[in-house]
Amino acid sequence: FAKENTYLSEHLERPNKQRRQIVPWGWNHTLKKRLINEGIDPSTLPSEEELQFIRTHSRREFALAVHSRLNCNDSQVIGPDYRIVAANINEIEAFISTNGSAVLKSPLSGSGKGIRFVREGLSESDKGWCRRTLNKQGTVIVERRFKIIKECAMLFECHHDGIDFIGYS
């Protein structure tokens, strides 16, 4: 966390002493522990089971599984052959050897973090990143690198009544 977020609880109170709703980009055990240490009532935070559900469904592998079900053999949609879920360095190197440049993605990351772009093989730095990611998260997503025309992210808010599209970033 940045220095300005040292005391989260100070930022969670409105002038009239009402508590603000906590809506992080992503929940995890570290954030939950931090909020509890800042005095947030644990009963207002996700349970351990909910955190595990969030972690499982936040992994890129889950998104890839959903994507493959939505694909429906439509030639306008990028098919599953443009990427692999690699469990070791050899699989990563073989994919890059076959496809040239690639994008390496850690299974649990967002907002541009956990992404590396490689061309013509892995550098020693890339290999170290892959080993650490494989060790901590179990896999590395390896995708063919396409020419980027425009980058954006779609933002959604999930709640008990469904999912709302918020906008683009």
Task: Locate predicted features.
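Conserved N-proximal alpha/beta basic substrate-recognition cap immediately N-terminal to
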Residues: 2-98, 110
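Generic beta-sheet signal
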Residues: 20-22, 102-104, 140
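An acidic- and aromatic-residue-enriched active-site/binding cleft used to recognize and process polar
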Residues: 27-29, 107-109, 121, 145-147, ...
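Residues at the C-termini of beta-strands that transition into short coil/loop
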Residues: 46, 119, 169
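Intrinsically disordered, low-complexity boundary segments flanking structured domains
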Residues: 68-71, 91, 102-104, 126-132
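Glycine-rich phosphate-binding loop of ATP-grasp-fold ATP-dependent ligases
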Residues: 81-83, 101-129, 151-153
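Phosphate-binding site of ATP-dependent enzymes
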Residues: 100, 125-169
